[in-house]
Amino acid sequence: MKSVLGFKKAKANREKISMVTCYDYTLAKIINSTDIDCILVGDSGGMVLLGKKNTTYTTLDDMQFMTQAVANGATDKFIVADLPFMSYRQSLEITMQAVTTLIQSGAHAIKLEGSSGNLDIIKHIVNSGVPVMGHIGMTPQFINSFGGFKVQGRTEEAAKHLLEEAKLLEQAGCFGIVLECIPANIAKDITQNLDIPTIGIGAGSNTDGQILVLQDMLGMNTDFQPKFVKKYIDGSKLFSDAINTYVKETKANTFPTKEHCYDYC
């Protein structure tokens, strides 16, 4: 997927959209060689890459650093970058400075969380020439309001509110919406009532696409295994085994061998 137009085309053709998160150059280069449609430089990188407590601690400087790294590695992919916590809630000027920073760092679009209080901001960003992706449901930047990472939309009233939010985001100009940790039937209803694609994470299989944190799907984080994540490999074990093999060979002096040495060895 080369541009935001690919999202609209995929929705029209009923083609599923695949997305993963990425935060660094090395993994971005690998992803660039795959069939993945889109990369999200998520504020989750503050947790996954930098070890921060939650995404409210991720800064614009963090996002700039990660976006530049990913853009340098994934030169053929469409890149969306998260606006970090409070970067779009202080003033329009501060918001647009943050948007400019991420776009000039290599992002092709930005994502922000929630609808209430954001609609005029989204319209302004879109009218400024920057595509915007919405995000509703379990929005991690609102963790303190939610009282933790909890599934949203489990009551009739909450489900109705999510649909209303999605429609408002579409009307404001969003080209797509992430639906996070909501019941599958609610995600299906939202998807069927929008002309823009929905990207699910913990939202069932009836969304227009899926997104996962790369390190989660690669099994690199043994301490975080939510229900909605499928581990495609046991990355933690693969890496640990490789490192331990290197340690053993070093101590046994079986590495390096002649093939790893220059002529003077």
UniProtKB/Swiss-Prot annotation:
InterPro entries: Pantoate_hydroxy_MeTrfase, Pyrv/PenolPyrv_kinase-like_dom, Pyrv_kinase-like_dom_sf. GO terms for molecular function: 3-methyl-2-oxobutanoate hydroxymethyltransferase activity; magnesium ion binding. GO terms for biological process: pantothenate biosynthetic process. Its EC number is 2.1.2.11. Pfam families: Pantoate_transf (PF02548). Mg(2+) binds at D43, D82, E113. 3-methyl-2-oxobutanoate binds at D43, S44, D82, K111. Binds 1 Mg(2+) ion per subunit. It catalyses: 3-methyl-2-oxobutanoate + (6R)-5,10-methylene-5,6,7,8-tetrahydrofolate + H2O = 2-dehydropantoate + (6S)-5,6,7,8-tetrahydrofolate. Pathway: Cofactor biosynthesis; (R)-pantothenate biosynthesis; (R)-pantoate from 3-methyl-2-oxobutanoate: step 1/2. The active site is at E180 (proton acceptor). GO terms for cellular component: cytoplasm. Its cofactor is Mg(2+). Keywords: Cytoplasm, Magnesium, Metal-binding, Pantothenate biosynthesis, Transferase. It is found in: Cytoplasm. Homodecamer; pentamer of dimers. Belongs to the PanB family. NCBIfam families: panB, PRK00311.1. Catalyzes the reversible reaction in which hydroxymethyl group from 5,10-methylenetetrahydrofolate is transferred onto alpha-ketoisovalerate to form ketopantoate. This is 3-methyl-2-oxobutanoate hydroxymethyltransferase. The lineage of its organism: Bacteria, Pseudomonadati, Pseudomonadota, Gammaproteobacteria, Thiotrichales.
